[in-house]
Amino acid sequence: MVINSIINKKKIPLYGNGKNIREWIYVDDFINAIEFLIKKAIPNQTFLIGSGYAEKNIDLINKIIKIIKKETEFKIEKNLIKYVKDRAGHDRVYKINSNKIRKLGWKHKIQLNDGLLKTIKHYI
């Protein structure tokens, strides 16, 4: 949504003050984790898949903007962010404990900034 908003020169909606924290994982890492678990064939178990990269939403948006400015010739408008009222009871942090899958030997491969760059290049 952030990249599409930038491409289409639309405001990026950011809930609350932007300091909510979310964990991020590159899609290829997520797929690799699913394939890893299928091959392990462990029945009746639940596994949480995560990268361990947790960022404030505002920081992630700023990273995306910085990468687009550095890696592309795309012109970025000023004042891109539109702060939106947060919903009542919105969780401040979404971060998981993926130790269970890590103990089996799985680990993400794509670093956050590398994943952001790959995603941006896909869209632009």
Residue map of PLM features:
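C-terminal substrate-binding subdomain of Rossmann-fold SDR/epimerase-dehydratase oxidoreductases
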Residues: 3-124
